[in-house]
Amino acid sequence: VSGKENQDQAGGSIDRSTGKAGFRPQGGGLMTTRRSFLQGAAATGIVFCSCGMESAARAQPKPPRLPVKVGGKHVLTVDVHSHCYFHEALNLMGDTADKVLPPVKGVPEHFIVIEQRLREMDAMAIDMEILSINPFWYGKDRDTAAAIVRVQNDKLAELCASRPERFGAFASLALQFPDLAVQQLETAVKKQGLRGAAIGASVLGQDFSDPKFHPVWAKAEELGAVLFVHPQSTPELAKRFKGNGWLSNTIGNPLDTTIALQHLIFEGTLDRFPGLKVLAAHGGGFLPSYAARGDHACFVSPQNCNPDIALKKKPSEYLNQLYFDAMVFTAEGLRHLVAQVGASQIMLGTDH
């Protein structure tokens, strides 16, 4: 992380008077830089409640913020992995609404007032959070999914001016209907001021390398939109995950992300869309720790690889095109992630 005054995690600078992100272009090779990664996502505002608490929040005394300093200078900390939900969207799920929220401590706090969230952020030395909503609507029909996404994105856009210096957001997409997702992404970026989208690691088992999703990736590349990949476990392994330890989460979630990224690499999707900005949750799952195995797969077993797909570089080198949050739990885990992918590809993420 740079020690430059007002420098954010994406390498850009924030104008404190406007809350807008100013990013200077970078030259160089294919590797995307953090400076260009979020492209204004940090300037998108959001609040966490849908109960009209903005005025009350502004009337509250501002809590002291714990600063982070490097070399004696304040470093702006941007958390790219932080969650919230909207009651209005969950209400559209009907009888399945009670299955949306994950069974973890603190979930009711996803429905919180802004001043409470700010106090928590200040206590953690987080200057800015980029909000995302894990997809829970991929199994819904077109009209219901569209309504859920509309509610969520409209609310993010409607409330974006409340605290633009503290909050940003990734939009929601109905990826099960790629043509609709393209429209939603374009609206989110061009009309609603959002700069990316949060997506699952597949759409009910349909991998993102499937050509049906190419129009979505093409639009994201065109718009410079960030795609935040967050896992939803691997339900096809539910039988093996039974037992103690919540294995569907501890193993299933990172595995889900790993599979998603490997398909994007091995099916040539990242070659087809070299400018695609993909951010993987939880340090990219297991991929960074075992990427070198992929370099040998087609060499030792060519019959299991498609001769019509000629990758432009070694599979492990595609890690330089991907971004990873730092949600790996330990300092040693973070050191390992840095050693595998490089500090330039790692973003601050807390899973708050």
Segments predicted by a language model, with ranges:
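Helix-coil boundary/capping segments in enzymes
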Residues: 3-5, 14-15, 19-352
